[in-house]
Amino acid sequence: MQPMEVPEIEKQIGINLYSTNTEGLGGRLRQEVEDFIVKEITNREEGKDGRYLVLELTKRDWDTHHFTRTLAKILQISQKRISVAGTKDKRALTTQKISIFDIDALEIEKIHLKDVELKVLGRSRKSVELGDLWGNEFIITIRDISSSPEETRTILEKTNSKVLTQGGVPNFFGVQRFGSVRSVTHLVGKAIVEGNFEKAAMLYIAEPFPEEPEETKAARQFVKETRDFKEGLKTYPLRLGHERAMMNHLISNPEDYSGAFSVLPKNLYRMFVHAYQSYIYNMILCRRIESGISLNRAVEGDIVCFRNEAGLPDSSKTEKVTSETVNAMNRLIKHGRAFITAPLPGFNTEFASGVPGEIESKILKELRVSLEGFNVEEFPEMSSKGTRREVLLQVEPKFEVGEDELNPGKSKTVLEFMLPKGSYATTVLREYMKVDPLQMS
């Protein structure tokens, strides 16, 4: 069977293959908000004491940051007193834990927001934080599938069989990591690592992308050609608040391109270098698959990480596989106690040896990556020493198939699966749907 062509936007972020060679379902996601259900899995149990009130939040079609901002306003408190373990998709029905510092449970009775349900779980001496999150359960409906329910079932069974045989799907970073409409974050990160802040700033502010609205493209093109930030502010839409903030900085501080990044929120400016690391990781993972090296059987030179108390891969505990340990390591991998990894390179990353190491160094050479560049002297908060990430997303989706009541004559399927934190549902769905990520929803 001919390998299926990967959409252009995925090639731009370093993904050039599917690991399954089965037919794609096509179809689309999120026709209704309830088609995408996400439930957080945490390791917390709440008690009766402590200064943090812990709640279960169920929200429909709400952005997490927008919700916490709105909640803080109603309660008349600082947004900093509200903590979550992870941000969730906006166009979805999501359930997660949140904590609020120093507030009475009775205050929650004030909250009457459309499509929001808050349930008091108890109190704690510590806030809800990222470390509490183990993973997420997903119940996802794919609609508008052209094949009949019987054909849809056959396609799903074939893909599922492939996924189970290979132990899961490649743990790629999906388009969300790079910007869905404008996959520019990794290019900005590359320029930063190369020490070229001027190029980085201009890419972020002024590089037009085909999928953007025409007036946005024209505004960006003008600034790209003229560097007239003052004039540019007149045409840049208000929704491009980050770009506008950077241009304002450059009007007041001409040529201070690294300083222009300091006006951005910390989580955004840190994302640039992380996205570049993710791009390199995706490239290395594709090359490993193309080379015919298994993702669930270690070879000599591989670096594996081990399972933590939550049963999740812990990249801080690693070991290099040798000829003496390869069989024992593969037994651990088979039982889900060890995981093969690939690098998110930085200034202090451990690299594999043997054939996996050759692949890693070859990609770094082809991309002309300077590891020292990840130590960003001009903007130390952007620096990254690097880490390693498991190459396989162990997943066993269950599915149901039926007629699509919203699209007469079409089929639908409901997929259920669990993923560890930091992984993307779309990474699983791409193997089943095989469509352009921008057309998925």
From Swiss-Prot:
NCBIfam families: tRNA_TruD_broad. Could be responsible for synthesis of pseudouridine from uracil-13 in transfer RNAs. Keywords: Isomerase, tRNA processing. It catalyses: uridine(13) in tRNA = pseudouridine(13) in tRNA. InterPro entries: PsdUridine_synth_cat_dom_sf (IPR020103), PsdUridine_synth_TruD (IPR001656), PsdUridine_synth_TruD_CS (IPR020119), PsdUridine_synth_TruD_insert (IPR011760), TruD_catalytic (IPR042214). Signal peptide: none annotated. It comes from Methanosarcina acetivorans (strain ATCC 35395 / DSM 2834 / JCM 12185 / C2A). HAMAP family: TruD. The active site is at residue 89. This is Probable tRNA pseudouridine synthase D. GO terms for molecular function: pseudouridine synthase activity; RNA binding; tRNA pseudouridine(13) synthase activity. One of its GO terms (biological process) is pseudouridine synthesis. Its EC number is 5.4.99.27. Residues 168-393 form the TRUD domain. The keyword Plastid does not apply. Belongs to the pseudouridine synthase TruD family. It comes from the Archaea.
